[in-house]
Amino acid sequence: MRKFAYCKVVLATSLVWVLLDMFLLLYFSECNKCEEKKERGLPAGDVLELVQKPHEGPGEMGKPVVIPKEDQEKMKEMFKINQFNLMASEMIAFNRSLPDVRLEGCKTKVYPDSLPTTSVVIVFHNEAWSTLLRTVHSVINRSPRHMIEEIVLVDDASERDFLKRPLESYVKKLKVPVHVIRMEQRSGLIRARLKGAAVSKGQVITFLDAHCECTVGWLEPLLARIKHDRRTVVCPIIDVISDDTFEYMAGSDMTYGGFNWKLNFRWYPVPQREMDRRKGDRTLPVRTPTMAGGLFSIDRDYFQEIGTYDAGMDIWGGENLEISFRIWQCGGTLEIVTCSHVGHVFRKATPYTFPGGTGQIINKNNRRLAEVWMDEFKNFFYIISPGVTKVDYGDISSRVGLRHKLQCKPFSWYLENIYPDSQIPRHYFSLGEIRNVETNQCLDNMARKENEKVGIFNCHGMGGNQVFSYTANKEIRTDDLCLDVSKLNGPVTMLKCHHLKGNQLWEYDPVKLTLQHVNSNQCLDKATEEDSQVPSIRDCTGSRSQQWLLRNVTLPEIF
């Protein structure tokens, strides 16, 4: 009996295990089918394994790449090729994982299903294989498949063999149509982008540089804004990819685009008025006066309507401000979409050379945008950069005609309504040199940067570094920097203008010719013997060394 009972227990236990095995087999078989159905039903870009799963390997999750000491010399030599750490880039996978750097409120936003399609246009010239293909793979892996019409790679006359047939063979295997378009000769970013835009088929054109990495959820918020209003031109937050280590660092949603006196693009803090307009919701787009220009999306038809790029501009430089002014002045809107993040390798120097040099090219381009879009404010720019007035800027009649056709607003409207915190002083007592009566020398910013001392040098009468504005707010400005003194008998430093008076408040007496620093009650004096090129403040004595002539610079002769 015992033996029979024991057999029954063994048999029953075995039966339980058999039934359990069958259940598990059927369960996981069905789960696999469900997963297969789920993956087939989702757009390729929504399967986020390549995006969110941490991988092992150099640079994964955006971590910095550390080069061993024994390879440092080779790394330095390779760095010169593209002006970034090529060795580090080649160690990183094309589909490396990146952190989700979006604001928490962005991660739960829901976008319409019927968003427009986009063609992604990427111009390259002698780009590194690894950075170019990492850009392409990040677009494919992190974008809903049905939203990507195509990727258009425009080769601006590259000389490297691997960017010829090997590139064409590689991109044919990708799951998104990728077209390689060749420029017959070196044409520059502007004309190469125009070529890419001309062959694109998507409802939206998205321009990217050739050394970018898109993050999860980058595309939908851009397309959603254009669907909401086709005259809205949108930029992602541009995250920083280190040129030294390829570390991925989130960009700030608290900065927007502006420009300085020399029409150089600059990032500035988002002003309080824009925060108030968004009611403090940082997930809402920021209206930006200008864009950096490398990364943006625009409705394809609208791009044509507002005049694409100025084809009379050469190579690169100034085109971002020109299109920014045009968008705003001609009825469009320019935004930074804070829920979209795209990384960009920021280089300290360019590896490219340009016929005639970059200075000549940028001067020509800036002259064109000033003549067409800046009205009387162009004269302010010419005083700051008199060399611009000497360049041949070509025929602008078609661009002037475009402005009239589109019935665009004046530049004064742009400054008052879109960029009231512009660095261009609209109300001032003087704009020009500040000359010391005793030494006959002029204040000079010496091309120094923020937190450095203002200088004094022989007056040259050519504007540029010796142009200062004594504003209606009683600031002494040189570009976006104001003369600031923080201690008695101290030197005069240049700090960002804060418009709060304090250490940046100066009182000019046109009779005594003194510039009195109000907070300290001392007067601006000539340089001391200890430091012959740095003025300071001293107790007011009425001496000639404390007398200054504020002279308006006359407009240079314009050709």
UniProtKB/Swiss-Prot annotation:
Heart, brain, spleen, liver, skeletal muscle and kidney. Gene3D superfamilies: 2.80.10.50, Spore Coat Polysaccharide Biosynthesis Protein SpsA, Chain A (3.90.550.10). Changing residue 339 to A: Loss of enzyme activity. The keyword Iron does not apply. Its cofactor is Mn(2+). One of its GO terms (cellular component) is perinuclear region of cytoplasm. Changing residue 484 to A: Loss of enzyme activity. Mn(2+) binds at residues 209, 211, 344. Residues 29-559 are lumenal. GO terms for biological process: protein O-linked glycosylation; protein O-linked glycosylation via serine; protein O-linked glycosylation via threonine. It is an enzyme of class 2 (transferase). InterPro entries: GalNAc-T, Glyco_trans_2-like, Nucleotide-diphossugar_trans, Ricin_B-like_lectins, Ricin_B_lectin. Substrate binds at residues 156, 186, 316, 347, 352. It catalyses: L-seryl-[protein] + UDP-N-acetyl-alpha-D-galactosamine = a 3-O-[N-acetyl-alpha-D-galactosaminyl]-L-seryl-[protein] + UDP + H(+); L-threonyl-[protein] + UDP-N-acetyl-alpha-D-galactosamine = a 3-O-[N-acetyl-alpha-D-galactosaminyl]-L-threonyl-[protein] + UDP + H(+). The chain crosses the membrane at residues 9-28. CDD domains: beta-trefoil_Ricin_GALNT1, pp-GalNAc-T. Keywords: Disulfide bond, Glycoprotein, Glycosyltransferase, Golgi apparatus, Lectin, Manganese, Membrane, Metal-binding, Secreted, Signal-anchor, Transferase, Transmembrane, Transmembrane helix. It holds the Pfam family Glycos_transf_2. Changing residue 540 to A: Loss of enzyme activity. Changing residue 466 to A: Induces a decrease in activity. This is Polypeptide N-acetylgalactosaminyltransferase 1. It comes from Rattus norvegicus. The lineage of its organism: Eukaryota, Metazoa, Chordata, Craniata, Vertebrata.
